[in-house]
């Protein structure tokens, strides 16, 4: 559930309406790069229709796993397609709400979070009467073959268990409320060796390993005073979290040397290491005084050298570099068939 933080992109992750996928348009072969986007070339749209996001490369860079409401689905399910957008196919159960798919090293298995056992239908959206918040559904982690077969649960615990990604050397990092807060944990691919990585009050999530598996980048909220902490805990008791203040953090893969990278005072999320291990790409609304528009930014891992990457007037988010660093996949509202439609795009990365 590496969600986009504000109501502008709410249909992407919370109130998905049933829609059927539209056929590819001329955009499939047209460069959708904006003039200011000097680090991007050959921006191509890979999905058309429905809501599509959180597309992540396989370790060989040949395939993408992503979540979508295509085929008239009311809730996100997981799909796999070629890195060129070819042959999309359902790999989750078609029940409940599904999020955060990821490939195992080797590409023969996948991991995702789903509510299909606790809520076979779409779980209800959160009550927004007290302000915008994310619902912490009762997600559990599941492992399956790459075609969706042989499904089984992994490291089950009551509450929220999601936002799982995998390192090249066979570790899973994920967010869970199993100890009462939204913290990061890691474990082996079979669920053994479970270790809690964070224990500071606040939301720690959206974690990814560096290419060598030695470090983790993640987003975090940190209540600044007793009042904010009380508000955070009150929402958590209702299975909600408010994501309006998120910063990017890094730590060693064992949880040591936790360090805040950004100090933007904004909603910054979806961080991912460049394969060089020195730079981090992420999404943020820091450039919009109204907090509604999200773009991609690049920053050095020490917080220096902040650079804006995309200049779309609506939403760009969920960036991921290909393993060789030559491609960037991301989700965007650009070129939608209707306002707010989110699709998956791929671009050449230009240094």
Predicted regions and their residues:
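Short loop/turn segments that connect beta-strands within beta-propeller blades
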Residues: 82-86, 145-149, 188-192, 252-256, ...
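Hydrophobic beta-strand positions that form the internal "hydrophobic ladder"
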Residues: 64-65, 110, 172-173, 216, ...
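Residue-level detector of Asp-centered blade-edge/turn motifs that repeat once per structural unit
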Residues: 59-60, 105-106, 167-168, 211-212, ...
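Blade/loop signatures of beta-propeller domains
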Residues: 23-41, 139
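A flexible loop/linker signature enriched in serine peptidases of the S9 family
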Residues: 48-51, 68-78, 93-98, 113-140, ...
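Bacterial N-terminal signal peptides
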Residues: 7-15
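Beta-strand-rich domains and repeat architectures in extracellular enzymes and scaffolds
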Residues: 31-33, 41-74
């Amino acid at each position: 559930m590496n969600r986009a933080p504000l109501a502008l992109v709410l249909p992407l992750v919370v109130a998905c309406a049933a829609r059927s996928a539209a056929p590819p348009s001329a955009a499939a072969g047209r460069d959708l790069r904006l003039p200011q986007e000097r680090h991007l070339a050959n921006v191509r749209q890979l999905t058309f229709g429905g809501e599509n996001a959180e597309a992540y490369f396989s370790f060989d860079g040949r395939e993408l796993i992503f979540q979508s409401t295509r085929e008239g689905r009311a809730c996100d399910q997981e799909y796999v397609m070629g890195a060129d957008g070819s042959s999309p196919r359902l790999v989750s159960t078609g029940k409940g709400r599904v999020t955060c798919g990821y490939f195992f090293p080797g590409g023969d298995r996948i991991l995702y979070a789903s509510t299909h056992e606790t809520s076979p239908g779409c779980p209800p959206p959160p009550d927004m009467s007290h302000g915008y918040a994310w619902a912490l559904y009762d997600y559990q982690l599941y492992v399956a073959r790459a075609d969706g077969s042989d499904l089984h649960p992994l490291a089950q615990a009551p509450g929220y268990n999601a936002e799982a990604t995998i390192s090249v050397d066979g570790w899973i990092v994920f967010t869970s409320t199993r100890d009462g807060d939204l913290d990061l944990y890691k474990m082996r691919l079979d669920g053994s060796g479970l270790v809690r990585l964070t224990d500071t009050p606040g939301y720690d999530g959206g974690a990814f390993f560096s290419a060598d598996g030695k470090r983790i980048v993640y987003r975090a909220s940190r209540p600044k005073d007793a009042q904010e902490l009380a508000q955070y805990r009150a929402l958590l008791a209702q299975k909600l979290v408010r994501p309006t203040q998120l910063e990017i953090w890094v730590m060693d893969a064992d949880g040591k040397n936790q360090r805040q990278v950004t100090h933007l005072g904004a909603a910054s999320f979806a961080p991912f290491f460049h394969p060089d291990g020195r730079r981090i790409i992420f999404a943020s609304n820091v450039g919009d005084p109204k907090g509604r528009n999200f773009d991609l930014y690049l920053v050095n891992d020490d917080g220096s050298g902040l650079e804006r990457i995309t200049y779309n007037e609506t939403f760009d988010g969920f960036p991921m570099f290909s393993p060789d660093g030559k491609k960037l996949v991301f989700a965007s509202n650009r070129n939608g068939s209707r306002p707010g439609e989110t699709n998956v795009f791929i671009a050449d990365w230009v240094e």
